[in-house]
Amino acid sequence: LGTGSPGPPQPETRHAALRGAALVLPAVMAMRQVQEWMRTHDEPASWDGLLHRRCLMRPCSVRAGASKVLQGTGGPVVRRTGRAGWELIRTTVEVRVGGGSWQVTHELARRTSADLPAMTGKLTEPGTAFDPMTGGALYRLTYGDVAAWAEATGDRNAIHILPRRAAAAGLRTGPDAVAAHGLLLGALSLAVAAPSSQQQIDLRFIGSADVPVARCGGGGLWARLCVDAASGDIAQGRRLVLRRR
């Protein structure tokens, strides 16, 4: 990830990025199990078009000497409901990472009616918005970053890889942009505003971060994101895309 400053990232920036990736690892491991469950129980392409709405990670205690990364053996518990043209999917799974165990809940959504209007990102509410120039740090997110995350995590949902697919799934994403992974935004949030030890982590994806694939007009080939250094909330422009609880 690039910061708003010219030149290569500083060592502390790289260290923070590694910390954010490590903190979101339980959610990534859980998502892999959910993806495998979907492939087993649904059509092969059922992963494409799913929208990530929320991720909740709760720490649990495990016995000493647990393996470094061990996925829970029970598999995900999946609940599916329909509401107003959307399929809502809630999954819960336990994963073990390092010496800790986490119960991870992912909330996903899929549009089932093409006639529905696109979802709109929730604007920052009066009194809770922050000034991007004074209340947070600026970061650049490129399509290369999104593609690298897809390769590393195995989440190759078409909305993150192919232009127009996010809009078809129900997001207000431009024709030359993709939607960044929710957990990639979560890693960025946790890198900038690390939680206290063993604190539950609640990531709410209330809008899409649109990342351009091709240059549009005079704009650069990156998304400009502002991360609040205190809360970890992320905004693109004045539009909030991630809120931490």
Predicted regions and their residues:
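Hot-dog-fold acyl-thioester-processing enzymes
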Residues: 1-52, 117-123, 127-196
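Catalytic-pocket segment enriched in acidic/His residues
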Residues: 166-241
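Residue-identity detector for glutamine
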Residues: 10, 33-35, 71, 103, ...
